[in-house]
Amino acid sequence: NSKYFHYIHSMKCRIILELLAILFFTGCYNREQISRLDEAEALLQNKPDSALTILQQLKSEGSQAEQARYALLYSEALDKNHIKATNDSLIRRAWEYYKHHPKDLRRQCKTLYYWGKVKLRAGDKPGALRLYLKVEEKLKDTNEPYYAGLLYSQIGEVYYDQMNYSRAYHYFREARNNFRQADNTREETKATLDMAAATFNSKDMEKAMRLYSAALDLADEHKYDKLAKASLTNLASLYVVSGKKQIPHDLLQRIELSARQD
């Protein structure tokens, strides 16, 4: 009996030790996974390629919350690296979790936003618009001008593609105002260019000229060379097609200089 008791006791000890080891290593793995997800998230804005590299080295494992976070970060990283995913299975996985967590409003909105972008790339414009308008409703309860600006830009793009230029202009203007509030001058310049394009297609040449000029001033001030060139090219084209005005001398010089640099 004593031998039997000793055997049972040693078995229990071994099982307990094995369980403790499993728990220890699982805990270490989870902490490592969370740490790597934190690292990827911190890099997403300015170094999206590095963020994507980290995420590609990880697996969608851990708790439901970790798996959802991984799916959202991966979707965001693909988008920021201009990898045009048209399959929504990954972002759907994130939504399956976040839709039950209304207190995590920021991630709910981001999930719906990136899901909308996937739908848009897949050609489902009505589906994308439905998701974007759902995000717009949710964002009313937050103070996230940068993300609101991104959202309004996307909604504007949908309406612009549908040739509804007045609605497109409305949302591009909302985007510009939010980017201005967020102090993101690059995105503000892009949104101003979008407003100008919508205005041009609405046949309001004078207003389009003012907006392209405003975009050019912003791009010059902050040395956004590509945006300055886009503003300049469109402004020159407007002067030509309007037939109303002679191109100002300083603008003509800039156009000639830009043409020579090409």
Annotate each predicted stretch with a short phrase.
Residues 1-12:
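N-terminal secretory signal peptides that target proteins for export/translocation
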Residues 1, 20-21, 168, 175:
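N-terminal leader/targeting signatures
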Residues 13-15, 209:
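Glycine-biased, low-complexity coil/linker segments
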Residues 15-24:
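Sec-dependent N-terminal signal peptides
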Residues 7-8, 27-262:
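A "functional boundary" signal
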